[in-house]
Structure formats: structure tokens, C-alpha cells
């Protein structure tokens, strides 16, 4: 199927992977609110104890209404953002969101070990409360360990739900949920400066 992309003036969103990541996270937020607080009287934008890893959503809060949350980003300096390493995050959370951040762990942080991204996924899952959900996206072609895990189905075995999304000309096509159906990791920036394919999924607690 073809996804309806999200458009926003920040960072030429409609041209890159944010177009699909933000459309998907918006759907996740709405579904998560209903899961946690299904009554009509529930306050909108409530995701329980919420953590965002990678300061992304603050740039789009005029579109996606989110509750107060802890935001951790190792490198981006901004008001309300804690500059600490992902492995130093502690606490217990009902909802964790990370958009195109996990692929940088082990690659762009001086570690020189791409497999640290998979370790980070396990660490964040360990912070989930019972019934918690970790919504995660990452582009292919950036972190070799994540690409390898996609090729061998390791990520699929860990995820509760997953969707593979790839460019189809000027559009983005969905290559299936919980089933690859022709998806494969594509090199980052093959035809333009951004991602060619994105993995989007949810993890439960360990």
C-alpha cells in the first residue's frame, strides 16, 4: 500500500523519512492513549510515564500533541533535553518513543561498534513497565548491525509489531506488517540525501 506522508516545514519533512515516521508515530500515540485510558473522559495526550530518546517530536508539537515527557538526547542541546548516553537512562516507563535515533548508537557516538544499537534496544526494553510499549524507527543503510538483524529476522522476533517502508518513486510504500513481503535494507542516500527504507515497530518489555 502507499502511505499518506506527513508534511511539515521543519527540516523539509515531506522529502525525507520523517514523512512516514511522523505519520506512524501519530497513529501510535492515538492508539496508545486509547489503550491506557479508554474512557471518553480520559485526558488527551496521556501516555503514562513517557520517555523520548532523541529530541525529535518537540519540533512537531504543533501537529502531534504529547504529554509532558522526559527527553534524552546525547548530543542535541535544547531546553528540557537531558544530554546523557542511552545506557545511562534509568527509571520505569509506560511508553518509550525513539525516532531515527537508535541507528546512531555505536556508529556516531565514538564507540565504533554498530552492535551497540541492538544493546540499546534491549536496555530500553528493560525500562518498560509491564504492559509498556517502545515505539522505534530507524532507517536502513546507516547501521550495519541493524541491517544484519533485519536480514536475519532478529528484529522481527523481538518486535510486537513491525512495518517495513521503502521509497517507491516519489511515494512511500508499505511492505507489510509482521512479514517482509519483498522488503530489504537499502543503502542510505542511494537516490537522494535521505533514507531509502525505514523499519518501524513496537517492542514490549523484557
What do the predicted segments below correspond to?
Residues 27, 55-67:
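Conserved SAM-binding loop of SAM-dependent methyltransferases across substrates and taxa
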Residues 97-102, 106:
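A conserved beta-strand element that flanks and buttresses the S-adenosyl-L-methionine
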Residues 149-206:
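Class I S-adenosyl-L-methionine
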Residues 112-133:
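A short glycine-rich, Lys/Arg-flanked "PGG" loop and its adjoining helix->strand segment in the class I
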Residues 137-141:
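Short strand-turn motif at the edge of the Rossmann-like AdoMet-binding core
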Residues 62-98, 115-120:
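Adenosine-cofactor binding site in Rossmann-like domains, unifying the SAM/SAH pocket
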Residues 9-14, 106-118, 145-149:
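Short, flexible/disordered intra-domain loops and linkers
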Residues 1-44:
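Class I SAM-dependent methyltransferase Rossmann-like catalytic core
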Amino acid at each position: 500500500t502507499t502511505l499518506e506522508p506527513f508534511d511539515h516545514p521543519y527540516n523539509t519533512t515531506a522529502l525525507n523519512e520523517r514523512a512516514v515516521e511522523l505519520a506512524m508515530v501519530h497513529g501510535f500515540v492515538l492508539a496508545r492513549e486509547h489503550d491506557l485510558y479508554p474512557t471518553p473522559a480520559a485526558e488527551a495526550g496521556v501516555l503514562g510515564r513517557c520517555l523520548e530518546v532523541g529530541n525529535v517530536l518537540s519540533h512537531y508539537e504543533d501537529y502531534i500533541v504529547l504529554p509532558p515527557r522526559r527527553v534524552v538526547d546525547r548530543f542535541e542541546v535544547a531546553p528540557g533535553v537531558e544530554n546523557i548516553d542511552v545506557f545511562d537512562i534509568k527509571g520505569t516507563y509506560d511508553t518509550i518513543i525513539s525516532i531515527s535515533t537508535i541507528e546512531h548508537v555505536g556508529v556516531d557516538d565514538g564507540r565504533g561498534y554498530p552492535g551497540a544499537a541492538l544493546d540499546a534496544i534491549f536496555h530500553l526494553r528493560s525500562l518498560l513497565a509491564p504492559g509498556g510499549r517502545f515505539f522505534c524507527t530507524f532507517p536502513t543503510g546507516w547501521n550495519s548491525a541493524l541491517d544484519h538483524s533485519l536480514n536475519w529476522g532478529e528484529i522481527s522476533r523481538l518486535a510486537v509489531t513491525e512495518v517495513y517502508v521503502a521509497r517507491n518513486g516519489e511515494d512511500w510504500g508499505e511492505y507489510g506488517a509482521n512479514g517482509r513481503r519483498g522488503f530489504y535494507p537499502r543503502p542510505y542516500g542511494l537516490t537522494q540525501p535521505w533514507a531509502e527504507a525505514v523499519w518501524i515497530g513496537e517492542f514490549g518489555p523484557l
